[in-house]
Amino acid sequence: MTSKSSPLIFERSREGRYAYSLPKSDIKTNSVESLLDDKFIRKNKAEFPEVAELDLVRHYTELSNKNFGVDNGFYPLGSCTMKYNPKINEKVARIPGFSESHPLQDEDQVQGSLEIIYSLQEELKEITGMDEVTLQPAAGAHGEWTALMIFKAYHENNGEGHRDEVIVPDSAHGTNPASASFAGFKSVTVKSNERGEVDIDDLKRVVNENTAAIMLTNPNTLGIFEKNIMEIREIVHNAGGLLYYDGANLNAIMDKVRPGDMGFDAVHLNLHKTFTGPHGGGGPGSGPVGVVKELASYLPKPMVIKDGDKFKYDNDIKNSIGRVKPFYGNFGIYLRAYTYIRTMGATGLKEVSEAAVLNANYIKARLSEHFEIPYKQYCKHEFVLSGVRQKEFGVRTLDMAKRLLDFGVHPPTIYFPLNVEEGMMIEPTETESKETLDYFIDTLISIAEEAKNDPDKVLEAPHTTVIDRLDEATAARKPILKFENLKQEK
């Protein structure tokens, strides 16, 4: 690996340098030893970087210029919905009455904030077809876990605590079985058929008296709509199980079909994906959960309700699984999502899904002559192609993904879902122009040609990035995860 990267902030540190200073205090101070027990006092000086303000600003400005995001390039990361985040969202989120409020203020002082929460709950109920919605969960997987804990409490409360199996398709997001495990369930895999949909015969085989639920994304991770969803619902419900909707792919079906109308009992949404909360940097996210009326009494508390002309917290929820997030979740993301929903309206959200589906099918059609397409039918918002043709020349999907970096394009999701060999999952979203799509398509086609005629160029990529190709074997055996490790290496 060759690095053209900047020094770490710790490497810029020089003893005695500082960014600012405070006047000498005339207040008598006490020693740390007089205030804390020995066990709480550091034995060694903390290694904070010591840098001047200008060095600090330049360091992080330089790093920010090297970041890649939706605002500076195409980001077709499958199943992540890396759409453009309208800047009006940021303007609303920075209104002082919102940005300077505190969750411990009296309800009377934050009526505007509570109204936003309540109104967003109502909008999401309409979009999903659910009867009640909580905004508390902080991310998609958190929403999955919350819904499964609601299912668990529901089954236990109905004398069916033995139901400890959750059915998960082989094309599902990896968070689905992980969330099931965290909620105390065992995952049972159901196979996909030759069309990439849930195999109904295999579903009938795995459903039994211990089935608590099935977790589905529709359209699924292959970008294929589960056309047999009503039959799936009947099979699972007849066995006493519940249906959970993973909202990761809701961007494909807004104002077209609702999870509630498909028979789902609970749904989580990703406000940071479908509803333009900025994401990709590790947070904050938001994963609201909606449920049918039979499960409403199990929702986390508090809920925000409207009482006359006022809004307030409601802690009187009979079977609540309890609080799942301090205060009431990530309020800043609620503001952005609510702004997006209100500015788009129902017609706009419908057009979003139509454009997302059109863009994905356009890319798929143009690439079909150059790559293996395992599932030929029309896709929804995303699709999966395979790099098996290029593998014949010694070039893998990983190599092509790294080569894309040289063209200023973020690679798609690769090797996922697991049931497609050399898979590359592409989700263009609705916000990209035809010119951008054509650039991406032409670039991938040129890389496919390179794989055939000049494979070393692809195998050695990337060539223009700050960090060249990683030595993955050494990185796995000798990871440098903190500054102390780096000092030891040097």
From Swiss-Prot:
<comment type="function">
    <text>The glycine cleavage system catalyzes the degradation of glycine. The P protein binds the alpha-amino group of glycine through its pyridoxal phosphate cofactor; CO(2) is released and the remaining methylamine moiety is then transferred to the lipoamide cofactor of the H protein.</text>
</comment>
<dbReference type="InterPro" id="IPR000192">
    <property type="entry name" value="Aminotrans_V_dom"/>
</dbReference>
<dbReference type="InterPro" id="IPR015421">
    <property type="entry name" value="PyrdxlP-dep_Trfase_major"/>
</dbReference>
<dbReference type="GO" id="GO:0004375">
    <property type="term" value="F:glycine dehydrogenase (decarboxylating) activity"/>
</dbReference>
<dbReference type="GO" id="GO:0005960">
    <property type="term" value="C:glycine cleavage complex"/>
</dbReference>
<dbReference type="InterPro" id="IPR015422">
    <property type="entry name" value="PyrdxlP-dep_Trfase_small"/>
</dbReference>
<comment type="similarity">
    <text>Belongs to the GcvP family. C-terminal subunit subfamily.</text>
</comment>
<dbReference type="GO" id="GO:0030170">
    <property type="term" value="F:pyridoxal phosphate binding"/>
</dbReference>
<dbReference type="Pfam" id="PF21478">
    <property type="entry name" value="GcvP2_C"/>
</dbReference>
<dbReference type="GO" id="GO:0005829">
    <property type="term" value="C:cytosol"/>
</dbReference>
<keyword id="KW-0663">Pyridoxal phosphate</keyword>
<protein>
    <recommendedName>
        <fullName>Probable glycine dehydrogenase (decarboxylating) subunit 2</fullName>
        <ecNumber>1.4.4.2</ecNumber>
    </recommendedName>
</protein>
<dbReference type="InterPro" id="IPR023012">
    <property type="entry name" value="GcvPB"/>
</dbReference>
<dbReference type="Pfam" id="PF00266">
    <property type="entry name" value="Aminotran_5"/>
</dbReference>
<dbReference type="GO" id="GO:0019464">
    <property type="term" value="P:glycine decarboxylation via glycine cleavage system"/>
</dbReference>
<dbReference type="InterPro" id="IPR049316">
    <property type="entry name" value="GDC-P_C"/>
</dbReference>
<dbReference type="InterPro" id="IPR020581">
    <property type="entry name" value="GDC_P"/>
</dbReference>
<dbReference type="GO" id="GO:0016594">
    <property type="term" value="F:glycine binding"/>
</dbReference>
<dbReference type="InterPro" id="IPR015424">
    <property type="entry name" value="PyrdxlP-dep_Trfase"/>
</dbReference>
<feature type="modified residue" description="N6-(pyridoxal phosphate)lysine">
    <location>
        <position position="273"/>
    </location>
</feature>
<keyword id="KW-0560">Oxidoreductase</keyword>
<comment type="subunit">
    <text>The glycine cleavage system is composed of four proteins: P, T, L and H. In this organism, the P 'protein' is a heterodimer of two subunits.</text>
</comment>
